[in-house]
């Protein structure tokens, strides 16, 4: 039993909508890939929200952005996060915290996930200091007003958002 638990703790899930993926997300993924032998970046379909980018596009942008990292896989999911984590035989949910304002929501989420399964722990990482203010929402707003987002997102995301703006 102990070996199974240890194996589960070797695999982490970093879930999010990544709408779009930002350099803050990339920083967390890159650093987490050096901590965990296996990291699954789990892209939520988020049927309750109206995502700016399609689920397939978000997955593709992430694969292009982190595909070079050893031990990192990008997978879409559309079920309850804790169920997805257990299906993947993972023992860690990795979450990013940018500011104190993120903490309250993330604390509640971690508590709920622990209540749903005691086999899974939630760990938090903060992005590098110069990336803490970046959010997908702010990136979308800047892009919608034709602002320069190149310092906030990977180049493939810049191209995708420009393409999207030209279609509108």
Curated annotation (Swiss-Prot):
Gene3D superfamilies: HUPs. Keywords: ATP-binding, Coenzyme A biosynthesis, Cytoplasm, Magnesium, Nucleotide-binding, Nucleotidyltransferase, Transferase. Its main location: cytoplasm. Pathway: Cofactor biosynthesis; coenzyme A biosynthesis; CoA from (R)-pantothenate: step 4/5. ATP binds at residues 17-18, 25, 96-98, 106, 131-137. The record marks 25 as: Transition state stabilizer. Substrate binds at residues 17, 49, 81, 95. InterPro entries: Cyt_trans-like, PPAT, Rossmann-like_a/b/a_fold. Its cofactor is Mg(2+). One of its GO terms (cellular component) is cytoplasm. One of its GO terms (biological process) is coenzyme A biosynthetic process. It is found in: Cytoplasm. It catalyses: (R)-4'-phosphopantetheine + ATP + H(+) = 3'-dephospho-CoA + diphosphate. Its EC number is 2.7.7.3. Homohexamer. Belongs to the bacterial CoaD family. This is Phosphopantetheine adenylyltransferase. It comes from Legionella pneumophila (strain Paris). The lineage of its organism: Bacteria, Pseudomonadati, Pseudomonadota, Gammaproteobacteria, Legionellales.
């Amino acid at each position: 039993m102990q070996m199974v638990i240890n194996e589960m703790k070797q695999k982490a899930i970093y879930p999010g909508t990544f709408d779009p993926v930002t350099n803050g997300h990339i920083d967390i993924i890159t650093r987490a890939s050096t901590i965990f032998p296996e990291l699954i970046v789990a892209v939520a379909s988020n049927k309750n929200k109206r995502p700016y980018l399609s689920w397939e596009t978000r997955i593709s942008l992430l694969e292009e952005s982190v595909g070079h990292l050893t031990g990192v896989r990008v997978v879409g999911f559309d079920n309850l996060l804790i169920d997805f984590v257990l299906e993947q035989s993972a023992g860690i949910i990795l979450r990013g915290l940018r500011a104190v304002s993120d903490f309250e929501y993330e604390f509640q989420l971690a508590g709920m996930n622990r209540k749903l399964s005691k086999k899974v722990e939630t760990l938090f990482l903060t992005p590098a200091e110069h990336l803490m203010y970046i959010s997908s929402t702010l990136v979308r707003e800047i892009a919608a007003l034709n602002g320069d987002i190149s310092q906030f997102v990977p180049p493939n995301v810049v191209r995708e958002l420009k393409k999207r703006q030209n279609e509108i």
